[in-house]
Amino acid sequence: MVRGEVFRLPPPKSARGHEQRGARYAVVVQADEFLGLSTLLVSPTSTSARAASFRPTVTLAGQQTRVLAEQTTVVDPERLGRSAGRLEAHELRAVDEALMLVLGL
């Protein structure tokens, strides 16, 4: 597992309000040196989310999808499904920029 790798993420059991529902992909955004922790920071994706400066578009499994930087969350690595590949370098840079925007860095 490395930063920028994409995994299938099963749906949460208790989503509320505007939290994402349904199975989707998740991009690992945690720094590689912290991947040994018991939890993992990921940003979920959506094919139906509206375009925004903090939602970079990436290609996953041949389909355009948006990374929801504003919904970055912590998951137990055991919740992740199989790896679906890795983001291209330019896509990961776009995710980094979105995270900086959302976090005010």
State the predicted function of each range.
Residues 1-105:
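Conserved functional hotspots at enzyme active or ligand-binding sites that engage polyanionic ligands
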